[in-house]
């Protein structure tokens, strides 16, 4: 894992510097490319010695949902030419860290037993931003095993207010 981070860091830093004031757009297309590159079949295709850089580029850009800007195309070609397709997800993660550091925000993943939308999500967001003391970029994922409540992951901090966590605490207390 540390090796991937070491390989990805220069790419993420170069893209961060080159993106300038357009960090949001760069993050969007980089996340899309990272999701595509995470596909095992694509990695096998790209790793095939009989497949050219152009063929790999055409497949990835063809799968992309949106039209890639020139900066994205150039970045993708560079990554493919250097044989770093498998590192794209880590590049995207490190780019987000740099982007968040500049804006003073953090990524937060909210795991919930039930869908969170509208006012409920806005209330939760306001409460969590107050709790963590910074602006949070939310991603909500359903996890029915929580039974109720939410589990929030912000960097290396976890706030677990789920029913499942409370039941586990009660179990530990009763067994002790």
Swiss-Prot record:
Membrane protein topology class: Peripheral membrane protein
SUPFAM superfamilies: N-terminal domain of the delta subunit of the F1F0-ATP synthase (SSF47928)
Xref: InterPro entries: ATP_synth_OSCP/delta_N_sf (IPR026015), ATPase_OSCP/dsu (IPR000711)
Keywords carried by this UniProt record: ATP synthesis, Cell inner membrane, Cell membrane, CF(1), Hydrogen ion transport, Ion transport, Membrane, Transport
Pfam family, one: OSCP
Gene3D superfamilies: N-terminal domain of the delta subunit of the F1F0-ATP synthase
GO cellular component terms given for this protein: plasma membrane; proton-transporting ATP synthase complex
Major localization listed first in the record, in broad terms: membrane
GO MF annotation terms: proton-transporting ATP synthase activity, rotational mechanism
Subcellular location: Cell inner membrane
Assembly with partners or alone: F-type ATPases have 2 components, F(1) - the catalytic core - and F(0) - the membrane proton channel. F(1) has five subunits: alpha(3), beta(3), gamma(1), delta(1), epsilon(1). F(0) has three main subunits: a(1), b(2) and c(10-14). The alpha and beta chains form an alternating ring which encloses part of the gamma chain. F(1) is attached to F(0) by a central stalk formed by the gamma and epsilon chains, while a peripheral stalk is formed by the delta and b chains.
NCBIfam families assigned: ATP_synt_delta (TIGR01145), PRK05758.2-2 (NF004402)
PANTHER family for this protein: ATP SYNTHASE DELTA CHAIN
Family: Belongs to the ATPase delta chain family.
Function, in words: F(1)F(0) ATP synthase produces ATP from ADP in the presence of a proton or sodium gradient. F-type ATPases consist of two structural domains, F(1) containing the extramembraneous catalytic core and F(0) containing the membrane proton channel, linked together by a central stalk and a peripheral stalk. During catalysis, ATP synthesis in the catalytic domain of F(1) is coupled via a rotary mechanism of the central stalk subunits to proton translocation. This protein is part of the stalk that links CF(0) to CF(1). It either transmits conformational changes from CF(0) to CF(1) or is implicated in proton conduction.
Name of the protein described by the UniProt record: ATP synthase subunit delta
Species of the source: Polaromonas sp. (strain JS666 / ATCC BAA-500)
Gene: atpH
